[in-house]
Curated annotation (Swiss-Prot):
GO terms for cellular component: plasma membrane; proton-transporting ATP synthase complex. One of its GO terms (molecular function) is ATP binding. Belongs to the ATPase epsilon chain family. GO terms for biological process: proton motive force-driven ATP synthesis. The keyword Transmembrane does not apply. This is ATP synthase epsilon chain. CDD domains: F1-ATPase_delta. It comes from Neisseria meningitidis serogroup B (strain ATCC BAA-335 / MC58). F-type ATPases have 2 components, CF(1) - the catalytic core - and CF(0) - the membrane proton channel. CF(1) has five subunits: alpha(3), beta(3), gamma(1), delta(1), epsilon(1). CF(0) has three main subunits: a, b and c. Keywords: ATP synthesis, Cell inner membrane, Cell membrane, CF(1), Hydrogen ion transport, Ion transport, Membrane, Transport. Produces ATP from ADP in the presence of a proton gradient across the membrane. It is a peripheral membrane protein.
Amino acid sequence: MSIMQVEVVSSEQKIYSGEATFIVVPTVQGELGIYPRHEPIMSLVRPGALRLTVPGEDKEVLVAVSGGVLEVQPDKVTVLADVAVRSAEMDRARAEEAKKAAEAGISQAKDDKALAEAHKVLAAAIAQLKTLDYIRSHKK
């Protein structure tokens, strides 16, 4: 079984560092599935669920990413995410409330800094909601 090293890092912390046999990353071109020895590429990440297949794990490791940059090398994948949250740390009610607050913040922003912050919070909330929807639709 071929493996690759995967690093998922947000501006606040390292979210995942370890091996994987497969990873799915939400990119601006669509979901990108990556196996070990993939051709080198770079892409922009869009809000959504990043999914990792990890050796020895029965379930996928899920991380909500709000955007960022993906770099793929034959033996290593790096995701530099604006905001990233492990699925175990997510709560639907909090994510929905954050989405509503961010939407209100966008409409009430008085300057570019406030608008950018509201967009960042909105992207993070959307990513969490998409990840929670993925979990719900794939429960067995």
